[in-house]
Protein backbone atom coordinates (compact mmCIF):
# COMPACT_ATOMS: atom_id res chain seq x y z
CA UNK A 1 0.00 0.00 0.00
CA UNK A 2 1.37 3.41 -0.93
CA UNK A 3 2.25 5.82 1.83
CA UNK A 4 -0.19 8.66 2.37
CA UNK A 5 1.15 11.87 0.88
CA UNK A 6 1.83 15.09 2.74
CA UNK A 7 -0.69 17.93 2.83
CA UNK A 8 0.55 21.52 2.84
CA UNK A 9 -1.89 24.32 3.60
CA UNK A 10 -1.10 27.91 2.69
CA UNK A 11 -3.18 30.99 3.26
CA UNK A 12 -2.66 33.59 0.53
CA UNK A 13 -0.20 36.43 1.16
CA UNK A 14 -1.37 39.74 2.56
CA UNK A 15 -4.05 41.23 0.30
CA UNK A 16 -4.83 44.87 -0.38
CA UNK A 17 -7.88 44.63 1.84
CA UNK A 18 -6.02 42.76 4.60
CA UNK A 19 -3.75 45.78 4.75
CA UNK A 20 -6.76 48.13 4.88
CA UNK A 21 -8.49 45.98 7.54
CA UNK A 22 -11.62 45.49 5.41
CA UNK A 23 -13.94 42.48 5.28
CA UNK A 24 -13.09 40.85 1.95
CA UNK A 25 -14.92 37.56 1.48
CA UNK A 26 -15.58 36.90 -2.21
CA UNK A 27 -14.48 40.37 -3.37
CA UNK A 28 -11.57 39.80 -5.76
CA UNK A 29 -8.62 41.87 -4.56
CA UNK A 30 -4.91 41.53 -5.25
CA UNK A 31 -1.81 41.15 -3.10
CA UNK A 32 0.25 43.90 -1.53
CA UNK A 33 4.00 43.99 -2.10
CA UNK A 34 4.33 42.35 1.31
CA UNK A 35 1.86 39.67 0.27
CA UNK A 36 3.84 38.93 -2.89
CA UNK A 37 7.02 38.61 -0.84
CA UNK A 38 5.22 36.26 1.56
CA UNK A 39 4.17 34.10 -1.37
CA UNK A 40 7.72 33.89 -2.73
CA UNK A 41 9.07 33.03 0.72
CA UNK A 42 6.44 30.33 1.19
CA UNK A 43 7.71 28.59 -1.93
CA UNK A 44 11.26 28.81 -0.63
CA UNK A 45 10.19 27.24 2.67
CA UNK A 46 8.38 24.44 0.86
CA UNK A 47 11.51 23.67 -1.16
CA UNK A 48 13.81 23.93 1.87
CA UNK A 49 11.68 21.37 3.73
CA UNK A 50 11.60 19.00 0.74
CA UNK A 51 7.83 19.28 0.41
CA UNK A 52 7.74 19.87 -3.32
CA UNK A 53 4.09 19.53 -4.34
CA UNK A 54 2.82 17.15 -7.01
CA UNK A 55 -0.52 18.92 -7.41
CA UNK A 56 -1.98 22.25 -6.33
CA UNK A 57 -5.54 23.16 -5.37
CA UNK A 58 -6.71 26.74 -5.06
CA UNK A 59 -9.78 28.96 -5.21
CA UNK A 60 -11.16 31.22 -7.93
CA UNK A 61 -9.91 34.39 -6.22
CA UNK A 62 -6.84 36.19 -7.51
CA UNK A 63 -5.15 36.64 -4.13
CA UNK A 64 -4.95 32.86 -3.77
CA UNK A 65 -4.20 32.19 -7.44
CA UNK A 66 -1.37 34.76 -7.45
CA UNK A 67 0.05 33.40 -4.21
CA UNK A 68 -0.01 29.89 -5.66
CA UNK A 69 1.75 31.01 -8.84
CA UNK A 70 4.49 32.88 -6.95
CA UNK A 71 5.01 30.02 -4.50
CA UNK A 72 5.25 27.43 -7.27
CA UNK A 73 7.65 29.63 -9.22
CA UNK A 74 9.83 30.05 -6.15
CA UNK A 75 9.84 26.29 -5.57
CA UNK A 76 10.46 25.57 -9.30
CA UNK A 77 7.12 23.69 -9.57
CA UNK A 78 5.16 25.82 -12.03
CA UNK A 79 4.65 22.76 -14.23
CA UNK A 80 2.50 20.73 -11.82
CA UNK A 81 -1.28 20.35 -12.30
CA UNK A 82 -3.38 23.18 -10.84
CA UNK A 83 -7.04 22.65 -9.97
CA UNK A 84 -9.29 25.57 -9.07
CA UNK A 85 -12.68 25.47 -7.40
CA UNK A 86 -15.06 27.99 -5.87
CA UNK A 87 -15.41 25.53 -3.00
CA UNK A 88 -12.01 26.71 -1.74
CA UNK A 89 -13.08 30.38 -1.81
CA UNK A 90 -13.02 32.51 1.31
CA UNK A 91 -16.15 32.61 3.41
CA UNK A 92 -18.71 35.03 1.95
CA UNK A 93 -19.09 37.89 4.43
CA UNK A 94 -22.46 39.06 3.14
CA UNK A 95 -23.30 42.71 3.72
CA UNK A 96 -20.03 43.16 5.65
CA UNK A 97 -17.95 42.87 2.47
CA UNK A 98 -16.10 46.13 1.92
CA UNK A 99 -16.65 47.41 5.47
CA UNK A 100 -13.86 48.47 7.82
CA UNK A 101 -13.49 45.94 10.63
CA UNK A 102 -12.75 48.46 13.38
CA UNK A 103 -15.68 50.66 12.33
CA UNK A 104 -17.98 47.63 12.19
CA UNK A 105 -16.94 46.61 15.69
CA UNK A 106 -17.53 50.14 16.99
CA UNK A 107 -20.97 50.28 15.37
CA UNK A 108 -22.31 46.87 16.39
CA UNK A 109 -20.29 46.10 19.52
CA UNK A 110 -17.69 43.49 20.42
CA UNK A 111 -20.12 40.61 20.93
CA UNK A 112 -21.91 40.96 17.59
CA UNK A 113 -18.66 41.67 15.75
CA UNK A 114 -17.02 38.50 17.09
CA UNK A 115 -20.13 36.43 16.41
CA UNK A 116 -20.08 37.47 12.76
CA UNK A 117 -16.32 37.17 12.42
CA UNK A 118 -15.41 34.06 14.36
CA UNK A 119 -18.45 32.02 15.49
CA UNK A 120 -19.15 28.73 13.76
CA UNK A 121 -22.81 29.18 12.91
CA UNK A 122 -23.69 32.91 12.85
CA UNK A 123 -23.70 34.43 9.33
CA UNK A 124 -23.59 38.19 8.75
CA UNK A 125 -26.62 39.87 7.13
CA UNK A 126 -26.89 38.86 3.44
CA UNK A 127 -25.49 41.11 0.76
CA UNK A 128 -27.99 42.80 -1.54
CA UNK A 129 -27.98 41.42 -5.08
CA UNK A 130 -26.56 43.92 -7.57
CA UNK A 131 -24.76 45.91 -4.87
CA UNK A 132 -21.17 47.08 -5.25
CA UNK A 133 -19.51 44.07 -3.64
CA UNK A 134 -21.91 41.29 -4.65
CA UNK A 135 -20.92 38.49 -7.06
CA UNK A 136 -24.25 37.69 -8.71
CA UNK A 137 -23.07 39.07 -12.10
CA UNK A 138 -19.59 37.49 -11.92
CA UNK A 139 -19.16 34.92 -14.73
CA UNK A 140 -17.04 32.72 -12.46
CA UNK A 141 -20.14 31.86 -10.48
CA UNK A 142 -22.73 31.59 -13.26
CA UNK A 143 -23.04 27.84 -12.73
CA UNK A 144 -23.94 28.29 -9.05
CA UNK A 145 -26.40 31.15 -9.43
CA UNK A 146 -23.91 33.84 -8.50
CA UNK A 147 -22.86 32.15 -5.28
CA UNK A 148 -24.05 32.66 -1.71
CA UNK A 149 -25.32 35.94 -0.29
CA UNK A 150 -23.71 35.28 3.09
CA UNK A 151 -22.01 32.40 4.92
CA UNK A 152 -21.03 31.27 8.37
CA UNK A 153 -18.10 28.90 8.87
CA UNK A 154 -20.48 25.94 8.98
CA UNK A 155 -21.52 26.81 5.42
CA UNK A 156 -17.88 26.78 4.32
CA UNK A 157 -17.41 23.36 5.91
CA UNK A 158 -20.49 22.10 4.05
CA UNK A 159 -19.20 23.23 0.64
CA UNK A 160 -15.48 22.45 1.07
CA UNK A 161 -15.39 19.08 2.85
CA UNK A 162 -17.15 17.07 0.11
CA UNK A 163 -14.57 18.41 -2.38
CA UNK A 164 -11.75 17.51 -0.01
CA UNK A 165 -12.96 13.97 0.62
CA UNK A 166 -14.13 13.24 -2.94
CA UNK A 167 -11.28 14.84 -4.88
CA UNK A 168 -8.23 15.91 -2.84
CA UNK A 169 -8.03 12.81 -0.65
CA UNK A 170 -7.60 10.69 -3.78
CA UNK A 171 -4.27 12.41 -4.49
CA UNK A 172 -3.13 11.97 -0.89
CA UNK A 173 -3.96 8.26 -0.89
CA UNK A 174 -1.63 7.56 -3.80
CA UNK A 175 1.26 9.30 -2.05
CA UNK A 176 1.19 12.72 -3.67
CA UNK A 177 2.27 15.86 -1.87
CA UNK A 178 -0.72 18.18 -2.10
CA UNK A 179 -0.51 21.97 -1.75
CA UNK A 180 -3.75 23.82 -1.00
CA UNK A 181 -3.52 27.60 -1.38
CA UNK A 182 -6.72 29.11 -0.05
CA UNK A 183 -8.10 31.54 2.53
CA UNK A 184 -8.31 32.06 6.26
CA UNK A 185 -11.79 30.60 6.67
CA UNK A 186 -11.70 27.87 4.04
CA UNK A 187 -8.50 26.63 5.70
CA UNK A 188 -10.08 26.95 9.15
CA UNK A 189 -12.92 24.78 7.87
CA UNK A 190 -10.48 22.11 6.73
CA UNK A 191 -8.37 22.26 9.90
CA UNK A 192 -11.53 21.88 11.99
CA UNK A 193 -12.25 18.66 10.13
CA UNK A 194 -8.68 17.32 10.21
CA UNK A 195 -8.11 18.05 13.90
CA UNK A 196 -11.69 17.20 14.92
CA UNK A 197 -12.03 20.57 16.63
CA UNK A 198 -15.22 21.48 18.44
CA UNK A 199 -17.35 24.44 17.40
CA UNK A 200 -16.01 26.32 20.42
CA UNK A 201 -12.37 25.46 19.71
CA UNK A 202 -12.47 26.75 16.15
CA UNK A 203 -13.41 30.24 17.38
CA UNK A 204 -9.85 30.71 18.65
CA UNK A 205 -8.03 29.43 15.57
CA UNK A 206 -6.32 32.10 13.47
CA UNK A 207 -4.32 31.22 10.36
CA UNK A 208 -1.55 33.64 9.31
CA UNK A 209 -0.92 34.75 5.75
CA UNK A 210 1.87 33.26 3.68
CA UNK A 211 3.27 30.57 5.99
CA UNK A 212 2.99 26.90 4.94
CA UNK A 213 1.38 24.49 7.40
CA UNK A 214 2.30 20.81 7.01
CA UNK A 215 0.04 17.88 7.85
CA UNK A 216 1.18 14.27 7.69
CA UNK A 217 -1.86 11.99 7.72
CA UNK A 218 -2.53 8.35 8.53
CA UNK A 219 -4.58 6.01 6.35
CA UNK A 220 -7.78 7.35 7.94
CA UNK A 221 -6.78 10.90 6.96
CA UNK A 222 -6.15 11.87 10.57
CA UNK A 223 -3.10 14.01 11.45
CA UNK A 224 -0.08 12.37 13.01
CA UNK A 225 0.42 15.70 14.81
CA UNK A 226 -2.74 17.55 15.81
CA UNK A 227 -2.56 21.10 14.51
CA UNK A 228 0.10 20.27 11.95
CA UNK A 229 3.52 21.91 11.81
CA UNK A 230 4.23 25.40 10.48
CA UNK A 231 7.41 25.60 8.42
CA UNK A 232 8.26 28.89 10.18
CA UNK A 233 6.73 28.55 13.67
CA UNK A 234 7.93 31.91 15.00
CA UNK A 235 6.55 33.87 12.07
CA UNK A 236 3.32 31.85 12.21
CA UNK A 237 2.76 32.72 15.87
CA UNK A 238 3.28 36.41 15.18
CA UNK A 239 1.05 36.28 12.11
CA UNK A 240 -1.76 34.49 13.94
CA UNK A 241 -1.63 37.10 16.71
CA UNK A 242 -1.93 39.84 14.09
CA UNK A 243 -5.00 38.15 12.59
CA UNK A 244 -6.56 37.85 16.04
CA UNK A 245 -6.05 41.58 16.57
CA UNK A 246 -7.88 42.70 13.44
CA UNK A 247 -10.75 44.98 14.31
CA UNK A 248 -9.02 46.66 17.22
CA UNK A 249 -8.41 50.37 17.33
Swiss-Prot record:
Name a GO molecular-function annotation: identical protein binding
Q: Which GO terms describe its cellular component?
A: plasma membrane; protein-containing complex
Active site location? 12, 90
Q: Does the keyword Chaperone apply?
A: no
Superkingdom, according to UniProt?
A: Bacteria
- The Enzyme Commission number assigned here is 5.4.2.11
Q: Which Pfam families match?
A: His_Phos_1
The protein's annotated pathway: Carbohydrate degradation; glycolysis; pyruvate from D-glyceraldehyde 3-phosphate: step 3/5
Q: Which UniProt keywords apply?
A: Gluconeogenesis, Glycolysis, Isomerase
Binding positions (substrate):
11-18, 24-25, 63, 90-93, 101, 117-118, 184-185
This protein's record includes keyword Isomerase: yes
The record ties this protein, via SMART domains, to: PGAM (SM00855)
Q: List the residue(s) that the UniProt entry marks as the site Transition state stabilizer.
A: 183
Tell me what reaction this enzyme catalyses: (2R)-2-phosphoglycerate = (2R)-3-phosphoglycerate
Record-linked InterPro entries: His_Pase_superF_clade-1 (IPR013078), His_PPase_superfam (IPR029033), PG/BPGM_mutase_AS (IPR001345), Phosphogly_mut1 (IPR005952)
What are the recorded Gene Ontology BP terms?
A: gluconeogenesis; glycolytic process
Cystines in this chain? none
Q: What is the stated purpose of this protein? A: Catalyzes the interconversion of 2-phosphoglycerate and 3-phosphoglycerate.
Q: Which family does it belong to?
A: Belongs to the phosphoglycerate mutase family. BPG-dependent PGAM subfamily.
How does this chain assemble?
Homotetramer, dimer of dimers.
This chain belongs to the protein called 2,3-bisphosphoglycerate-dependent phosphoglycerate mutase
What organism is listed for this UniProt entry? Mycobacterium tuberculosis (strain ATCC 25618 / H37Rv)
Amino acid sequence: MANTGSLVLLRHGESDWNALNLFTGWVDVGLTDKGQAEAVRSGELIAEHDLLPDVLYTSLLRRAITTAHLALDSADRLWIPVRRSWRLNERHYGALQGLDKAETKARYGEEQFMAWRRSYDTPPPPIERGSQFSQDADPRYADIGGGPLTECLADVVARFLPYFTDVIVGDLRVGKTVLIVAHGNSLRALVKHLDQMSDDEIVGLNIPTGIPLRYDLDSAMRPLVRGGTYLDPEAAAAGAAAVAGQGRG
